[in-house]
Amino acid sequence: RVLAAKECTNIYAPLANRLGIGQLKWELEDYCFRYLHPTEYKRIAKLLHERRLDREHYIEEFVGHLRAEMKAEGVKAEVYGRPKHIYSIWRKMQKKNLAFDELFDVRAVRIVAESLQDCYAALGIVHTHYRHLPDEFDDYVANPKPNGYQSIHTVVLGPGGKTVEIQIRTKQMHEDAELGVAAHWKYKEGAAAGGARSGHEDRIAWLRKLIAWQEE
């Protein structure tokens, strides 16, 4: 399993990243981390579990306030909390030499807007109601990542001075971020697929079989 995890780290996770398939990339990274660093994996998983209820209650209130403000301003967007992946938490702890409690993005929210205009309107609402940390702001909509990833990232100080990481993107950007190149296969094959299983789903299933094969 350790050998398989190393192969996933060196081959499949980078491949998923290059293809822009965020969902698969996160699954692979957590799988690899679980076997390559079992002690750290269990420690972070335990911390996340211990504080889950407090974190969920905090995010629920935070999201409720944002939804109300956006509705009042006529901004069309979905707002919800999003799970954090154990490997990404550990990597940020290592990179920035931070303790678990110091991380910005253990509390995380995503805003999926109807249009690009709604994206920036949502950003304006967020920054109007909460003080943001300028060093943690990135506009990958105006400046996409090399793999095509687009989102606005910002970190704000929520109630009680607790940091909250927020991603803002359109529905199209969200699908691209989750499925990568497979999203484009979906667009091309959607009309022909009808009610049947689409080609992009087959391709995603094939990529996931790589993980299952490595686990055997």
Residue ranges and their predicted role:
Residues 1-216:
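Nucleic-acid processing machinery
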